[in-house]
A protein has these predicted regions:
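Ubiquitin-like/PB1-type beta-grasp interaction modules and other compact soluble beta-rich domains
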Residues: 1-83
């Protein structure tokens, strides 16, 4: 099981702040997880439709979409950050 945490409009579109899920064995990266999540229903598809722009963190450390998620306890998703 891994805890998925959602922030900002990702959270608003899904309607959850977090959830614990058992990942399929073939989901090995952030990109794979985003693709899998997008298949879980209309709300998830809407939240992850801009998959390439969504940022992620594995166990509170920013991660690229190619990062392996094996052994992760928590994966967070949030929109791109801006600021000065």
């Amino acid at each position: 099981m891994v805890r998925l945490v959602y922030f900002a409009w990702v959270r608003e579109r899904i309607g959850l702040t977090q959830e614990d899920v058992a990942l399929p064995a073939d989901v090995l990266t952030i990109a794979g997880l985003i693709a899998w999540l997008a298949t879980r229903g209309e709300a998830y598809a809407h939240a992850f439709e801009a998959g390439a722009s969504i940022r992620a963190a594995i166990d509170k450390t920013h991660a690229k979409h190619g990062a392996l998620i094996t052994g992760a306890r928590e994966i967070a998703f949030f929109p791109p950050m801006t600021g000065g």
